[in-house]
Amino acid sequence: MRFFALFIYRPVATILIAAAITLCGILGFRLLPVAPLPQVDFPVIMVSASLPGASPETMASSVATPLERSLGRIAGVNEMTSSSSLGSTRIILEFNFDRDINGAARDVQAAINAAQSLLPGGMPSRPTYRKANPSDAPIMILTLTSESWSQGKLYDFASTQLAQTIAQIDGVGDVDVGGSSLPAVRVGLNPQALFNQGVSLDEVREAIDSANVRRPQGAIEDSVHRWQIQTNDELKTAAEYQPLIIHYNNGAAVRLGDVASVTDSVQDVRNAGMTNAKPAILLMIRKLPEANIIQTVDGIRAKLPELRAMIPAAIDLQIAQDRSPTIRASLQEVEETLAISVALVIMVVFLFLRSGRATLIPAVAVPVSLIGTFAAMYLCGFSLNNLSLMALTIATGFVVDDAIVVLENIARHLEAGMKPLQAALQGTREVGFTVISMSLSLVAVFLPLLLMGGLPGRLLREFAVTLSVAIGISLVVSLTLTPMMCGWMLKSSKPRTQPRKRGVGRLLVALQQGYGTSLKWVLNHTRLVGVVFLGTVALNIWLYIAIPKTFFPEQDTGVLMGGIQADQSISFQAMRGKLQDFMKIIRDDPAVNNVTGFTGGSRVNSGMMFITLKPRGERKETAQQIIDRLRVKLAKEPGARLFLMAVQDIRVGGRQANASYQYTLLSDSLAALREWEPKIRKALSALPQLADVNSDQQDNGAEMNLIYDRDTMSRLGIDVQAANSLLNNAFGQRQISTIYQPMNQYKVVMEVDPRYSQDISALEKMFVINRDGKAIPLSYFAQWRPANAPLSVNHQGLSAASTIAFNLPTGTSLSQATEAINRTMTQLGVPPTVRGSFSGTAQVFQQTMNSQLILIVAAIATVYIVLGILYESYVHPLTILSTLPSAGVGALLALELFNAPFSLIALIGIMLLIGIVKKNAIMMVDFALEAQRSGGLTPAQAIFQACLLRFRPIMMTTLAALFGALPLVLSGGDGSELRQPLGITIVGGLVMSQLLTLYTTPVVYLFFDRLRLRFSRKNSKPVVEI
């Protein structure tokens, strides 16, 4: 009593406390960063190594394996995967959430240093690492185009100057430049001319390397001057290399230009990038795992004027893709939804109370509670994102509940003629315990979420804390500011003048009278109600098992990502044509705004595309509908497939795949994996629950297998090293020398001129100079035959791995897909030497599925413990929790009705319902216990009176929560995929719960009271309850 009086009789102090909470919240709001979702990125580091010309198998065994053995010893590694292709190895290290990315980077560098002695010689550089996840979609893509500059020159400018500047911006983790390669001097050898002159390829290589050196020459000085010595020991352009003497044939000088074409070209000619059908250089910018995407994008945009100022006029720099506009639009939609929810909740209060003054009280309590929450969010390091703003939207209905309960009880005393200050004090005292019970039990629901680990726990923690803080502030406001405002703003009414008898009040009285009549009938037919209650319990179990499930709602971010997979024997020229064909098909779609793509590098038969869709307001279809439409057109392209998927704000794992979900096969036997992977992939492709099934196992690439006759080689005076060096010189794009320039270093690349290597007959023109100086044709000591070889070799951990990726057809849930895969694997009878498991998002979904029921049970148990402590009773918490089955039925039926799968967002809705619907029972039980204790009523009389007295606040709080969630259901636009499942779950659960719990709760109350009496008689011990 004294606590409440302290605030009621000191209005200035109470107002200033509320003002302080509001001001702190406003300051916190201005400082909060903006993001699509809470920070849930796993720390990921990518290690890259290269050995030009080495086969995928050689890269896997000689480069990947030594690095993996060293990197695998690092503490906190959650998953390690590697992919080795022609001349390139990439290892992805995914760390635990609690691992600091900078500390992990130091450990990675130490592991690379430790493995250095085990790596093969001839690597052009040491392995490097980047603190970025290559499987993440870029947050921004910049393109460089020019009518006069070559692609190599553009690439050089982009990688040397632009990429370096962008990489220094806070939050940027990696700037990947694609579409070409660095400039280089290319030496294209003529095998016939070399043979005629008696010049070996090694001789050419050594001559070029010897002629292009950079060594210190020293200085000369006398007593007065000092002269630094500088020579023309470096050759920098193709024109300088052409007259280079590489051999003497019968005293005549043989120059490089006599036996080769020497051109200023690029280091790797098998690269191509395009934007909207124009050749382009792409700068794909990815953020650091812990960086904020909006702040990073804003930093890049702020730097663009400076970047454009340093770019020559002949270059055009454009933003091809930016993920921030859809994120900002989504957050704006949530903020509008929040405002609508506040307005609807206040409207509900006004309709019930029909008083401007009375309505003003919760109208003040709601913003104070919500705004004050921003201060706590800032102190906790949170951001303004879809989930935290959704928490505040839902909190609108919660925070007004406390004020409504207090306000309604005070208004009831005022209507009975009590003076305002006395009514405020008496009314607050009566419901103070009720409000505390409601708030503490609601916060208790979220305690298991705060203890939940992994990605789901990290994702939901921000939602749970934000909502709990809002409820906590609301509790304080409802017991301090609300009664003070009631005492000083409201007026007493004459006992017989009941304003509720007009308009909505008359309807409410009629409803209350009808409820009283029906409740009497129900209390006389408790067995029927008991059957209904048990039926809802059983229906919950059946619906939960039957409803389709997924991990997270499929988002429409306005960005699509596509992976091209062509025939494994395709040439680069043909692959570039496929890229152009696919880009034309997509560019012609009316919903597409921009298309960029690239192909080449170490994987000639693959490519990537990034598609920016028009804003949601300018197109009718969702991203998935656009993918379905494009899939039909893209399937008509022969010799290659383009797999499209919508970019999501959450992507789990560092494994790159051509679809949203992955199933990984592991084996210690590469042969077993290659035998079973095609069988499994074929079986999964036939499943109607899967779409776009593809695999990263590519072991049917065309290979020419050369078989040396070692006896003949020995007789001819040729060793294997000389033969292998010949092949590397001729066909490996061998980097034989380095050109040093002020801004960068460039390579001299040697190979047989492509004009002379169009087919296998090029091998017949190859020759080796033996120990006697004679030219011996390759065909004299080697035979060749066509064979199949892998284009890539993949590992997970230290096991051979193959990942089958898949998308979901429209109308199929992830649970249906995973069940179909598990069933198919069982039917195939896969041997134990081949192990299968889900990866990435599908793996997290499986883990979440296993913990969902445990989480719900833990939440219910926590609420039971809190209520048991508050009521000092084992029984009354069970009565209160009896409201949950009906809410669960309503939520699951609503999801089925709207064809929405049960996702992590729907799970949040179920958790919220556990906290919401028990409020009705708390209000009933509190008043029933008080009536029994002070009024001497029987349990039946007490619960009946409690139901009638609390009918109005129950209706008000339920409708407030319902209207607070309704905008989430009706909202459209960006981000609605996240909001709607939460709103559907809450609205469905509230409607069903309100219909049933008004009757089941009093019946359960009486059932447990009778049970308590029977138990008391048997034990002859009094049960003390408050």
Curated annotation (Swiss-Prot):
Subunit structure: Part of a tripartite efflux system composed of MdtA, MdtB and MdtC. MdtC forms a heteromultimer with MdtB.
Database matches in Pfam families: ACR_tran (PF00873)
Subcellular location: Cell inner membrane
Family: Belongs to the resistance-nodulation-cell division (RND) (TC 2.A.6) family. MdtC subfamily.
GO molecular function: xenobiotic transmembrane transporter activity
Principal place of residence: membrane
Annotated keywords: Cell inner membrane, Cell membrane, Membrane, Transmembrane, Transmembrane helix, Transport
Database matches in HAMAP family: MdtC
Membrane-crossing residue ranges in chain numbering: 15-35, 333-353, 360-380, 387-407, 431-451, 463-483, 528-548, 853-873, 897-917, 953-973, 984-1004
Membrane-protein topology: Multi-pass membrane protein
SUPFAM superfamilies: Multidrug efflux transporter AcrB pore domain, PN1, PN2, PC1 and PC2 subdomains, Multidrug efflux transporter AcrB TolC docking domain, DN and DC subdomains, Multidrug efflux transporter AcrB transmembrane domain
Naturally occurring in which organism (per UniProt): Salmonella choleraesuis (strain SC-B67)
Protein name: Multidrug resistance protein MdtC
InterPro entries according to UniProt: AcrB_DN_DC_subdom, Acrflvin-R, Multidrug-R_MdtC
GO CC, one annotated term: plasma membrane
Keyword Translocase: no
